[in-house]
């Protein structure tokens, strides 16, 4: 189908007369235009309808094949009968039922290609009319072919499931978030409980350690009390003895004072340094010092309880201990050579002063002073200074550049070579007073050598670690020596 084109020819001076036409000709021209537009619309709609029908046929065939595969044998026969009753795509059958309006009122039946009202089609936009016609034709063709509704078909069910899953997704995400929060809370509580259990175990261990210490202290106090009860009657008998015996005992005490005097001084130092924070234990030596003069320390008069306590303590402690006091130098004593001696000087040399009296010069007026202030004189006077200043600036710039270059080179060297920090030199084995952690008041002193306690070694035979018992048991095999052969002459 082709559209007609009208060419208006120029009529010269008869333009006005040619434009004016009769009303009958105008009506005929309008009628022909309406017919042409209607024919064009019907052609376009027919082509659109045929394309839609072909698409629906392809879709229906695919659906039927899926149903045949998925349905039972009883349903497949029914589907085949229904397929036979279908009509060809060329013939279009309009529905016999009347179209109803929005409120149930019947609507005038319209033809498939909307040919009832030609004036309405002329006034409407062709693109809008084509879209509306396509939608209506698609619905009618679906009804004519006899396809099931999209909700009844499996694809429709899948679409409904998708819609439902879209609604469920936010709910599942919320539930997941709640579960994650609950899991995090459970993990935090487990960590908190684990830390609390650790603290409880540490406290239990500290409690057991303190209980063991308290038991040891109680045991020592009981032993000391027993020793005190035994020593009191011996002290009363010493009073009744004659004065000669007391003098001999005093002499013995003076002889043994060399060992006991450092004990008194060290005990006094410990009490002074502790500032009343630590309590002194009631030892037998302290009680004898408070009361009457004690008997001379001999091996026969030592109580068996003290020996047992010594043995128990030596077994518990991994280092050697003694009850005898000994002198230990924490620091080297000041020698007389190192003492700074003051230099005594009899005379101090002082420079001699003399007074020189200078009289001021006479005041002269400015007019009397002859000074040349010409430009040439002024420039000569300041040219040397300017040159010196420029030279200094040049030198300063050069020095700054050299310093920057030196710094860059030094940084490169530091990056390549890592400077190893030298460890401080060990000057003495003795610990410094700043490193003291705690003070222990006890009658047993550790045997210290070079600032560290000596280990408590068990009494056993000397053995070499690389010799086994088997090698010891094997007897030594003496090798036979053959006599030397002498050469015969």
UniProtKB/Swiss-Prot annotation:
A motif (Bipartite nuclear localization signal) lies at residues 380-394. Residues 371-389 are annotated as: Interaction with KAT8 HAT domain. Residues 179-227 form a coiled coil. One of its GO terms (biological process) is chromatin remodeling. Pfam families: MSL1_dimer (PF16801), PEHE (PF15275). Keywords: Chromatin regulator, Coiled coil, Nucleus. Residues 347-466 form the PEHE domain. PROSITE patterns: PEHE. It is found in: Nucleus; Nucleus, Nucleoplasm; Nucleus speckle. InterPro entries: Msl-1, MSL1_dimer, PEHE_dom. Residues 126-164, 224-311 are annotated as: Disordered. GO terms for cellular component: MSL complex; nuclear speck; nucleoplasm; nucleus. Component of a multisubunit histone acetyltransferase complex (MSL). Interacts (via PEHE domain) with KAT8 (via HAT domain) and MSL3 (via MRG domain); both interactions are direct. Component of histone acetyltransferase complex. Within MSL complex, promotes ubiquitination of histone H2B. Belongs to the msl-1 family. This is Male-specific lethal 1-like 1. It comes from Danio rerio (Zebrafish). The gene is msl1l1.
């Amino acid at each position: 189908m082709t559209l007609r084109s009208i060419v208006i020819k120029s009529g010269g001076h008869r333009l006005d007369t040619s434009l004016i036409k009769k009303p009958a000709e105008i009506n005929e021209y309008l009628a022909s235009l309406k017919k042409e537009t209607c024919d064009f619309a019907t052609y376009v709609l027919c082509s659109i309808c045929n394309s839609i029908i072909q698409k629906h046929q392809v879709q229906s065939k695919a659906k039927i094949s899926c149903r045949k595969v998925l349905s039972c044998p009883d349903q497949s026969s029914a589907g085949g009968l229904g397929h036979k009753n279908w009509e060809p795509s060329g013939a279009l059958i309009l529905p016999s039922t009347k179209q109803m309006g929005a409120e149930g009122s019947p609507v005038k039946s319209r033809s498939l290609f909307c040919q009832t009202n030609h004036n309405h089609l002329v006034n409407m936009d062709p693109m809008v009319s084509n879209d509306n016609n396509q939608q209506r034709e698609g619905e009618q063709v679906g009804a004519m072919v006899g396809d099931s509704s999209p909700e009844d078909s499996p694809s429709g069910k899948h679409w409904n499931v998708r819609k439902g899953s879209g609604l469920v997704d936010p709910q599942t995400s919320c539930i997941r978030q709640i579960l994650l929060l609950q899991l995090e809370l459970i993990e935090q509580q487990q960590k908190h409980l684990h830390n609390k259990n650790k603290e409880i175990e540490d406290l239990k261990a500290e409690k057991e350690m303190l209980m063991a210490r308290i038991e040891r202290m109680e045991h020592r106090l009981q032993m000391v009390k027993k020793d005190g009860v035994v020593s009191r009657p011996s002290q009363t008998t010493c009073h009744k003895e004659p004065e000669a015996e007391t003098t001999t005992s005093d002499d013995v005490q003076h002889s043994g004072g060399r060992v006991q005097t450092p004990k008194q001084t060290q005990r006094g130092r410990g009490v002074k340094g502790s500032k009343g924070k630590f309590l002194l234990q009631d030892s037998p030596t302290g009680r004898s010092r408070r009361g009457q003069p004690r008997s001379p320390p001999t091996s026969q008069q030592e109580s068996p309880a003290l020996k047992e306590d010594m043995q128990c303590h030596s077994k518990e402690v991994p280092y050697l201990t003694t009850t005898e006091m000994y002198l230990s130098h924490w620091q080297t004593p000041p020698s007389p050579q190192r003492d700074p001696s003051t230099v005594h000087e009899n005379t101090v040399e002082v420079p001699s002063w003399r007074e020189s009296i200078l009289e001021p010069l006479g005041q002269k007026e400015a007019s009397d002073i002859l000074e040349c202030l010409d430009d040439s004189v002024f420039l000569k006077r300041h040219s040397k200074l300017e040159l010196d200043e420029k030279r200094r600036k040049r030198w300063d710039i050069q020095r700054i550049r050299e310093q920057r270059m030196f710094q860059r080179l030094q940084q490169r060297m530091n990056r390549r070579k890592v400077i190893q920090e030298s460890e401080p030199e060990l000057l003495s084995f003795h610990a410094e007073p700043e490193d003291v952690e705690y003070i222990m008041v006890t009658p047993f002193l550790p045997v210290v050598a070079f600032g560290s306690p000596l280990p408590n070694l068990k009494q056993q035979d000397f053995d070499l670690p690389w010799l086994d018992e088997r090698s010891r048991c094997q007897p030594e095999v003496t090798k036979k020596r053959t006599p030397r052969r002498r050469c015969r002459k």
